[in-house]
């Protein structure tokens, strides 16, 4: 099982690199998405190709389609084939995608700015806040820790940087062939968005999903 998770992770890392190569000013966003999906299929296709005694192969491939979301589009933008939108210098671009091997899923997300210019001000603050919150959550994902306390930590980091956590975005546990499990870590609690506190358990797998904004969230 662990080996299959590692292979899936290697595949999403390769796919992310393929997407990044397409993220240049003037290039079509849809082409970047297509490059990610094609890379996942190509990379996962290198493994577990022998058939079992019943003639079946291990299932593998895209677990979450490549999404490329620009500027105020929060996430999960996967345009149709005919979409003509292109990247522009200075665009803030969020990439997210996922691959699986035998149902064991690995996901990946990256944020970049088109053009490679130095990022400053509020844009730098929000990107650093999301990165730091992710690093802290990884350290806090230990057996016995509370999902509610982890969520509160995310909000605390955002406050320190003067930015907002995007409401409605949650971190889910994952199981085989299940990308959105029942146990969640809320990035931001609200009257409309609540979850009972639960303990992190040994051998659980989580897909961190932390999104922050310079707006109200």
How does the language model describe each region?
Residues 1-217:
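Active-site neighborhoods and metal-handling regions in enzymes and metal-associated proteins
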């Amino acid at each position: 099982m662990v080996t299959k998770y590692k292979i899936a992770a290697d595949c999403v890392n390769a796919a992310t690199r393929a997407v990044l190569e397409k993220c240049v000013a003037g290039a079509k966003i849809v082409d970047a998405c297509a490059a990610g999906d094609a890379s996942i299929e190509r990379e996962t296709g290198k493994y577990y190709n022998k058939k079992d005694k019943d003639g079946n192969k291990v299932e593998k491939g895209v677990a979450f389609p490549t999404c490329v979301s620009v500027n105020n589009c929060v996430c999960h933008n996967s345009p149709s084939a005919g979409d003509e939108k292109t990247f522009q210098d200075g665009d803030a671009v969020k990439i997210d995608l996922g691959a699986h091997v035998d149902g064991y899923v690995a996901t990946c997300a990256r944020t970049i700015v088109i053009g490679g210019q130095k990022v400053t001000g509020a844009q730098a603050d929000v990107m650093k806040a999301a990165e730091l919150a992710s690093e802290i959550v990884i350290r806090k994902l230990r057996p016995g820790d509370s999902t509610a306390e982890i969520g509160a930590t995310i909000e605390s980091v955002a406050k320190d940087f003067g930015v907002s956590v995007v409401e409605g975005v949650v971190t889910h546990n994952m199981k085989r062939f299940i990308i959105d499990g029942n146990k969640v870590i809320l990035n931001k609690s609200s009257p409309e968005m609540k979850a009972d506190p639960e303990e992190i358990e040994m051998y659980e797998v989580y897909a961190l999903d932390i999104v922050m904004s310079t707006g109200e969230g």
